[in-house]
Design a protein with these regions (language model features):
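Polytopic transmembrane helical bundles with strong interfacial aromatic enrichment
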Residues: 3-137
Length: 137
């Protein structure tokens, strides 16, 4: 196996991992949305329900964004930036959506301080994806 073959193999594995992470997060976002719509109705007040649905919506948006970054990584010149974007999107899902899920379900307001960091991670992910797009051209 040449160095080129090894690099191509590692690159393909990273892309497959990001696609797997995107698919798992997409499924989790659908499950969360369904749980919120059917399992939590009547158990949460209107504000908590809105917070939960916001978490599920942004979870799905950024699960799709991870998949987009994985596809952008197919262009060798953009792979580093696309991997950075996918990482930021995943961190954003954990911090933003995760904190909102917990906040809506537990009512612990102290969790709210984490949410903006997740939003910043989402923004950084989109900037990194734009950077990847300039490299792919």
């Amino acid at each position: 196996m040449t160095v080129y073959d090894a690099a191509a193999f590692a690159f393909g594995q990273a892309m497959n991992l990001w696609l797997l992470i995107a698919a798992i997060n997409g499924a989790l976002a659908v499950a969360a949305g369904a749980f919120g719509a059917h399992g939590l109705q009547g158990r949460l007040d209107a504000h908590q329900m809105e917070v939960f649905q916001t978490a599920a919506r942004y979870h799905m948006y950024h699960a799709l964004a991870i998949g987009l970054a994985a596809l952008a990584a197919r262009t060798g010149a953009a792979s580093t930036q696309a991997n950075v974007a996918a990482t930021f999107f995943l961190v954003g899902i954990i911090l933003f959506s995760g904190s909102l899920y917990l906040l809506s379900l537990t009512g612990i307001r102290a969790l709210g301080f984490v949410t903006p960091f997740g939003g910043l991670a989402f923004l950084a992910g989109w900037i990194a994806l734009a950077w990847a797009a300039t490299k792919a051209v």
